[in-house]
């Protein structure tokens, strides 16, 4: 069982990253709310891991804190919610927003998340409302809005490739290609990095 990785951050291709630990490169999928907080490529990173073993694959889901990982594990306990959908849910809104939406039974907000229909949103509320009491959601994540995006410049070099990267990331989170392209084009501005485009696209849906 892999619980934590500490090593050199080699690649950042949202929502995936590659981290080298003792000469071995690990591919890790990470919610965008966590991805925004990663250090620059070439520096040391510490990532808490949720390890999934399937017949056809071994998957690593990464988080910056144990609390983020704990919330993810609570989300995927809900009926019909697997790791992929859990990743999309915690990419579409911050932990605080998600906890507040569940506590307030805000179905209309939850259904805006990729892959979350009305029935899934209702299940999340029914099954998670009691479990999330006392979580203190305010400190689960470092607010993404305060993160400097300067370090993201090593991800993407040209505006068009940044937009392509953002669209690909949104598709991998569950949005349809046409919808992903529309989301990015509506928020795109000159010199925006892929991470900025993804963040603003996701914010526009909530």
Curated annotation (Swiss-Prot):
Residues making up the signal peptide according to the UniProt record: none
Domain of life, source organism: Bacteria
Keyword match Translocase: no
CC annotations in GO: cytoplasm; Holliday junction helicase complex; Holliday junction resolvase complex
Chain segments carrying region Flexible linker: 144-157
Functional note: The RuvA-RuvB-RuvC complex processes Holliday junction (HJ) DNA during genetic recombination and DNA repair, while the RuvA-RuvB complex plays an important role in the rescue of blocked DNA replication forks via replication fork reversal (RFR). RuvA specifically binds to HJ cruciform DNA, conferring on it an open structure. The RuvB hexamer acts as an ATP-dependent pump, pulling dsDNA into and through the RuvAB complex. HJ branch migration allows RuvC to scan DNA until it finds its consensus sequence, where it cleaves and resolves the cruciform DNA.
Family membership noted in the UniProt record: Belongs to the RuvA family.
Protein name: Holliday junction branch migration complex subunit RuvA
Gene: ruvA
């Amino acid at each position: 069982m892999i619980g934590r990785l500490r090593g050199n951050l080699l690649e950042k291709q949202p929502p995936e990253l590659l981290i080298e630990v003792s000469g071995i490169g690990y591919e890790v999928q990470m919610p965008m709310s966590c991805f925004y907080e990663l250090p620059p490529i070439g520096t040391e990173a510490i990532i808490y891991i949720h390890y999934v073993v399937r017949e056809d694959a071994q998957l690593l889901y990464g988080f910056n804190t144990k609390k983020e990982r704990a919330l993810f594990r609570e989300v995927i306990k809900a009926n019909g919610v697997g790791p992929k959908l859990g990743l999309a849910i915690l990419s579409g809104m911050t932990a605080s927003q998600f906890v507040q939406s569940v506590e307030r039974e805000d179905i209309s907000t939850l259904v805006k998340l990729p892959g979350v229909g009305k029935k899934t949103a209702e299940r999340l509320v029914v099954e998670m409302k009691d479990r999330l009491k006392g979580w203190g959601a305010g400190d689960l994540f470092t607010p993404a809005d305060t993160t400097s995006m300067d370090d993201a410049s090593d991800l993407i070099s040209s505006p068009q490739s940044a937009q392509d990267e953002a669209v690909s990331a949104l598709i991998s989170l569950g949005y349809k290609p046409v919808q992903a392209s529309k989301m990015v084009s509506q928020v795109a501005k000159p010199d925006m990095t892929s991470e900025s485009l993804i963040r603003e696209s996701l914010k526009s849906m909530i």
